[in-house]
Amino acid sequence: MSQFSHFNEQGRAKMVDISDKSSTMRTAVAASSVRMIKEVFHKIEQREIGKGDVLSVAQVAGIMAAKQTSTIIPMCHPLALKGVDISFDWEEDGNAHILNIQVQVKTKGSTGVEMEALTSASVCALTVYDMCKAIDKGMIIGPTYLIEKTGGKNGDFHRASDI
């Protein structure tokens, strides 16, 4: 098992020094989902939610979240992201509908973008919940997980199967 690098000699948290790491292309893809009743699905699709176009707002919120990850996750480095792409698709499951969210983040730098992708996917889901909670407070968020990451000295990661 590898040692955690976010602790100093005193066992206190520190931001890892990445100044000696080479700059390479880094990507990460993360996913989340929101399970909801049919009524919410139909109102989102018909753009009848009082707070606005849910998917457009969630998409912008997700992009903003990716760019702000280092301000809310203490040990994340601020990164100059090169791209954030968010896609949505619907799945029907009995009486419920599931909004699947997928986020791809890219940069060229000396640290990965997994946390940016995960934060973005999470904030997309939270935004959908916030905009629709007046209709259904029983929506279920998640799971939220990393699908893949590329670049860096630890190599690539590709999830073996869907969750």
Swiss-Prot record:
Active site, renumbered: 130
Q: Which CDD domains match?
A: MoaC_PE (cd01420)
Keywords (A to Z) from UniProt: Lyase, Molybdenum cofactor biosynthesis
Does this entry carry the keyword Transferase? no
Instruction: From the UniProt annotation, give the residues forming the signal peptide.
Output: none
Q: Does the keyword Lyase apply?
A: yes
- Enzyme Commission number(s) of this protein: 4.6.1.17
Q: Which residues bind substrate?
A: 75-77, 115-116
| Catalytic reaction annotation | (8S)-3',8-cyclo-7,8-dihydroguanosine 5'-triphosphate = cyclic pyranopterin phosphate + diphosphate
Q: In which pathway does it act?
A: Cofactor biosynthesis; molybdopterin biosynthesis
Functional summary from the UniProt entry: Catalyzes the conversion of (8S)-3',8-cyclo-7,8-dihydroguanosine 5'-triphosphate to cyclic pyranopterin monophosphate (cPMP).
To which protein family does this belong? Belongs to the MoaC family.
Q: Which HAMAP family match?
A: MoaC_B
Q: How does it assemble?
A: Homohexamer; trimer of dimers.
What is this protein's record name?
Answer: Cyclic pyranopterin monophosphate synthase
Organism listed in the record: Bacillus pumilus (strain SAFR-032)
